[in-house]
Amino acid sequence: GKPLAMVNIMSVKHDEIYENLLAGIKDGCLKFGVPMVGGHLHPDGEVDSLGVAIVGIAKKDKLITSFGAEVGDKIIVAIDLDGKPHEMFELNWDTTYDKDKQLVQDQITAVQYLAERDYIKSGKDISNPGILGTLEMLLETSDKGAIVNLEDIPKNENISWENWLKSYPGSGFIFTANEENCEFIKEYLKDYSIEANVVGEVNGEC
């Protein structure tokens, strides 16, 4: 889909971080080209945290869902390898901070392009559970299983496998697709600094 606006929930324990949080929100909005239109502040939080929800539009019959994987689908892991571990949390693979804003926005549009032309059957963005954890979530909601070849997962050579599999990237996705579409998906995403590879196949052994 196309993101239109964001809202946030900001919880603050240490007053001195207010300005940095607001500056970061502003930078993020400019980077992604999506305005922050509202939010809620909890000024006496137990921790410093920021949560964001995004509102957007998408064609209802072209949504990428996490429950559409089918037996025989190929599994694709797609990640922007041009990044670095965040200085405050090494499992956060930062692919956006130093990137040109147009490329960051184009990466989102690229996935939208694939969805609207039915190249992707199911998918999820890689989130806190990491690469394999995100795949497991997709398989669970699809009531399926999978065989995965770890060595085929796109990886930055400077990061250990232990950290890489647990990391969540700024731009990273798990897709399932028909075999005949995989090569196009890989080549198309390469133009947007996203390395994609077939890493396995969906089966019925959930």
Name these PLM-found stretches:
Residues 58, 93-96, 116-117:
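Glycine/charged-rich beta-loop-alpha catalytic/anionic-binding loops adjacent to active sites
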Residues 85-103:
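Short, compositionally biased
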